Amino acid sequence: MAGWHHGRRVKKSTAVQEALEIIREMITSSDVEENLRLPSEEELALRLGISRLTVREALTILEREGVIARIQGRGTIVNRFARRLTSRIDSAREIGKFIAENGYTVGVDNVQHWWQAATALEAKKLAISEGEEILLVQKRFLADGNPAAFCIDRVPKKLFCDFNFSTADLEQAIFPFIEAHCRCQLTHDVIEIIPAVADTKLARCLQVNEGTPLLRLDAVEYDLEGRAVMYNTEYYLDHFVRFTLCRIVSYMT
């Protein structure tokens, strides 16, 4: 089918996640027309080097998200609004990807990390005891060199299997770092959306005035076994990052 040439193939270990990522790239690419019928499950499986079952799982997720519709007799159709669903807030992704999806070159600076005792709130979020040691990582994200977001990551020390890392390692994406050093597979997160304003520290970090409105996301990342692995607090400037969400209409008749 024209318009669907793609060179990436999927690694078996994260087949569904990678299949989702690649199909999303296909759908939002500039050379793909809206409302284009997707290739068959068999063809997608062949192109991505995965099973039809894995493709079916990925398509089921995309259908649930509202990106595609499977219509009997017509196949799998890309919904017209799919391209507008950038920076989806219902998809757990790295902050850098959200910034890139909004058209900016991503940078990271001011990375700091240390070990500290968990507060009562941190302990509750991570399902550990208050006072247990956690790794705390702070970093600032840039959009075309301008401050765009500030993130605080917290991970229980007891989950680490490998303590051989440096600040330079933490400048990279946090999800692969956690999976490698805690030997787990992150599968989903639960987020809270909290209106916030910049205090003195955030104003200085993000180069805005105190009291500037910010979007705050609190997220707890879970692994395949359902363990709370990481608790994140993220602050965004809305002129650099705008989130979208496709909601299913539900009403009482």
Label each residue range with its predicted role.
Residues M1-I50:
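Extreme N-terminal segment that seeds HTH/winged-HTH DNA-binding domains in transcriptional regulators
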Residues G3-G7, A82-T253:
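All-alpha effector-binding/dimerization core of bacterial HTH-type transcriptional repressors
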Residues V16, S40, I77-S91:
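Short, cationic-aromatic polyanion-contact patches
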Residues E63-G73, N79-R80:
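Beta-hairpin "wing" of winged helix-turn-helix
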